[in-house]
Amino acid sequence: KTASESSNAHGMPSDVEMGFPEAMLDMPIYASMNSSESNVDLDFFGFPEMVPFSSSMKLDEVIAKEKSVAQAWEQLSNSEYMPTVEAINGMKDRYGLNDWAVYTLVKKISEAVYDESDVNQRVVTQMFLLSQMKYKVRTGSVGDELVMLIPFAEQIYQVQYITDKELDMYIFGYSPLGTNTPLYTFTQDFSMGEKLISLAFTQQMHVGGDMQYKKVNLPLWSEILGEDFSVPINKPYVEFTYDYPQSDLLTYHHSVVDTQTSKAVLRGVRLKIIKDGMTDEEAVAYILNLVQNGFEYKTDYEMFGRAKPLFIEESLYYGANNCKDRV
């Protein structure tokens, strides 16, 4: 198959000329391999963490052929991989990670273990660990490199994909992929997992700690509320969502909002409604005015140089958004 085969507009890269973002945010997950201790040391949203990585898991050369992938899979299956999986699951529970955060963590671990030239070892390791966590993932090959093929619970935009048995498999690799580049899938489905990776936040991510909250002043909110207003935002969370895959708006609107952030917003609005003795109808109109006029209007391309729907915390952090974020 080619990368464009069976794909439609929702998966293809945008043909709009990209601008330059106003500010770049770094992913708040840093990983390095500690070979002497057989583990990966992490700076995870400001917290030190350690994930065991047994030498028995370390793969030698893997080529982008099904036989080589099968041999690597067998080695990993016979390795001491459970401590690694248990450590990742433990971090998932402690920090309230969603599925995309788990994938990002697994990816960072594999990149700490293997150099940039060892793309295939990275991809096989990612596929193996995610499958042990019951996620449905596959791999394919593009030229000499393996790529991850990931189905999602939601529709994803601006990422190329192929369709296999009515399931969209989104392509994540380490090299640019042309629209006519042949992509080969393997007949053997190594992963037995059935869970689709979801982009939604069904619970609050506990990352960064209280010291990482940044007080953000909102001049337009202050003007509408009639007093100075600021809101605490978990900066590591905003850094994490900066490069988030683009999905349907409901993914953003239905995601859980940070507790400290929501309490501050609700407290400020509630006090204004009570202070002014608003009726229910007046309160609704007031809140709608706040949502529609409390942010500077900026297009995605002005802010980020690309299409990017915003989570609620991001709208507050940047103090700007556009129509789709105000729905």
Q: For each predicted feature, which ranges?
A:
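A structural boundary/capping signal
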Residues: 1-327
